[in-house]
Amino acid sequence: MHCTVEICCGSYEDALVAYKGNADRIELTAALYMGGVTPSTACVTLVKRDTDFPVCVMIRPRGAGFCYSHAEFECMYEETRDLLNHGADGIVFGFLNPDFSINDEYTAKLVELVHANHKEAIMHRAFDCTSADTRALE
């Protein structure tokens, strides 16, 4: 039985170490000390150039929670489009409302964009901050 090994990488160098260590795929971020934020397109491009495993990229403009303004969401949406065009195999994200429920509107819009590009949409640790109800699982 094969277990998929995914490594959270905070840099291009981290990704190369994961690749040499035979990881199956990575979640690429930046600034892990802040819980991870969106890496640069240059970082994604280099990782895709120098490895051949799937690279799922975090979309998060800042630390300090997962509740975003409309302007922040618009930037995240456009950044997602850009990262998909630069080879991201999946997008890792999470949108919450002020009451810690999942922001269905933002989530649906980003999932639609990612799936329209035939890539994987992945909810990150924002899920761990949700209200403890089964609706979050849907």
Predicted regions and their residues:
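N-terminal pre-domain/capping segments
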Residues: 1-26, 31-38
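Hydrophobic faces of well-ordered beta-strands that scaffold small-molecule active sites
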Residues: 3-7, 26-28, 55-59, 91-93, ...
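Active-site beta-loop-alpha junctions enriched in small/polar residues
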Residues: 8-12, 31, 58-64, 96-98, ...
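Catalytic cores of alpha/beta
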Residues: 10-21, 65-82, 128-138
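Conserved, mostly hydrophobic/aromatic
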Residues: 18, 47, 83, 110, ...
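Glycine-enriched alpha-helix->loop->beta-strand junction motifs that scaffold or abut catalytic
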Residues: 20-26, 50-54, 87-90, 115-120
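Glycine/small-residue-rich loop that forms an oxyanion/phosphate-binding "nest" at active or ligand-binding sites
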Residues: 40-107
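Hydrophobic, well-structured mid-protein blocks that either form specific transmembrane helices
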Residues: 87-138
